[in-house]
């Protein structure tokens, strides 16, 4: 944050894209059953998907605490929706993204108290044809498997239509609100 602060006094758009679903080098992969969970794997996934983004936002401090237009977006996932969970599994990923969504909501409430123009959201990019989703693309219809460029374009469109009324929400690539 110090390096960023040396270049600007305020940020108006922050998009945090770091995330982990699997990392074979440390044995992290989506769990099919609760017995597959370990503390170290759970901590690794939470560290990247939840703790990292929000500790970074906290470190940004005054750069995002102003009264000008502000959008802070963190990549989330539809799979984090408690109300939409019909399959179970993927415990650490789902839980970390659900916790991320709660922190998104909390940050939105905190910043809106002093900046009614702040919009803090989670963004669901859809299923993107990357190494992260490769092993899990089997049942995805071809029109719902996006190239990284296509997903980025959809999310850019969403970012450009956000209003303060959407703050605290998780929004899909097509602009639809995802139920918590």
Task: Tell where the protein language model's regions lie, with residue ranges.
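Conserved Rossmann-fold cofactor-binding substructure of NAD(P)-dependent oxidoreductases
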Residues: 1-10
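Hydrophobic structural elements of the Rossmann-like NAD(P)H-binding subdomain
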Residues: 15, 73, 120-123, 133
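A structural motif corresponding to the C-terminal end of an alpha-helix
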Residues: 55-63, 107, 117-118, 161, ...
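Short-chain dehydrogenase/reductase
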Residues: 1, 57, 104, 152-155
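Conserved hydrophobic beta-strands of the Rossmann-like cofactor-binding core
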Residues: 10, 14-15, 19
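C-terminal helical subdomain
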Residues: 122, 130, 134-180
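Catalytic loop of short-chain dehydrogenase/reductase
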Residues: 20-25, 30-50, 55, 65-114, ...
């Amino acid at each position: 944050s110090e390096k960023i602060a040396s270049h600007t006094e305020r940020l108006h758009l922050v998009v945090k894209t770091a995330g982990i679903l699997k990392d074979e080098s440390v044995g992290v992969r989506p769990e099919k059953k609760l017995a597959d969970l370990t503390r170290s794997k759970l901590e690794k996934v939470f560290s990247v998907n939840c703790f990292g983004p929000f500790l970074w936002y906290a470190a940004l401090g005054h750069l995002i605490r102003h009264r000008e237009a502000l959008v802070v977006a963190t990549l989330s996932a539809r799979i984090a929706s408690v109300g939409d969970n019909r399959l179970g599994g993927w415990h650490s990923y789902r839980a970390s993204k659900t916790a991320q969504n709660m922190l998104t909501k909390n940050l939105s409430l905190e910043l809106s108290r002093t900046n009614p123009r702040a919009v803090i959201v989670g963004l669901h990019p859809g299923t993107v044809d990357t190494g992260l989703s490769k092993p899990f693309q089997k049942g995805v219809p071809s029109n719902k498997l996006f190239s990284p460029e296509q997903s980025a374009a959809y999310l850019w469109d969403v970012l450009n239509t956000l209003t303060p009324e959407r703050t605290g929400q998780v929004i899909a690539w097509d602009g639809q609100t995802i139920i918590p």
